[in-house]
Amino acid sequence: MSSSQKKAGGKAGKPTKRSQNYAALRKAQLPKPPALKVPVVKPTNTILPQTGCVWQSLGTPLSLSSFNGLGARFLYSFLKDFVGPRILEEDLIYRMVFSITPSHAGTFCLTDDVTTEDGRAVAHGNPMQEFPHGAFHANEKFGFELVFTAPTHAGMQNQNFKHSYAVALCLDFDAQPEGSKNPSFRFNEVWVERKAFPRAGPLRSLITVGLFDEADDLDRH
């Protein structure tokens, strides 16, 4: 068999160094697939178990201003999308960490009855009551730290959740710096750490923020 016949019908020979370099160059020039955005696990001194905890950041700083000295309020909505086995509401633990400039002593409180209407978070009840579902701690590293479990609603245990529920928090400037009537505070970062027990299955949280500047905004909505 001639060399031309070998090329036509025989086995292909080994690639030359030149062809290898050309293939490598072509591969390097191909567009790379977009990188996956994986939640960053941050070190923490929380009392909650570390296994399975996921940190999620809002991405952009959150600025709050007190226009009337009554404080500023904001709303977090957690969209719970469960796929898998039935879970218990107490299987979900959330931890919020607030990094605030300037350092300031504030008061957090939570409404205990929060629902949604037409995909919009709606808070009911007295927004100025004591925080019933968690504990507020000073955190030297981050500023403020709030640890709480998901509020328990009557008849919600042992069910699959196909709705969202919201947590309404308010920050009251009860220890304003001397000489400051309307202080402004910038939330550098707001994280939400969630802990789901293994039996809870996959969990996806969608975080949305709404600002409330008037004293009765939460009551009106």
Curated annotation (Swiss-Prot):
Variant or mutagenesis effect after changing Q29R: Symptoms induced change from chlorosis to necrosis
Pfam families in alphabetical order: Ilar_coat
Protein name in UniProt: Capsid protein
Modified sites of kind N-acetylserine: S2
Keyword annotations from UniProtKB, A to Z: Acetylation, Capsid protein, Host-virus interaction, Ribonucleoprotein, RNA-binding, T=3 icosahedral capsid protein, Viral nucleoprotein, Virion
A GO-annotated cellular component: T=3 icosahedral viral capsid
Annotated spans, Disordered: 1-24
Localization (cell): Virion
Function recorded in the entry: Capsid protein. Binds to the to the 3' end of the nonpolyadenylated viral RNA and is involved in viral RNA translation initiation. Probably binds RNA and plays a role in packaging.
Main location: virion
A single MF term (Gene Ontology): RNA binding
Superkingdom to which the source organism belongs: Viruses
Family named by the database record: Belongs to the alphamovirus/ilarvirus capsid protein family.
Subunit structure: Interacts with Arabidopsis ALKBH9B.
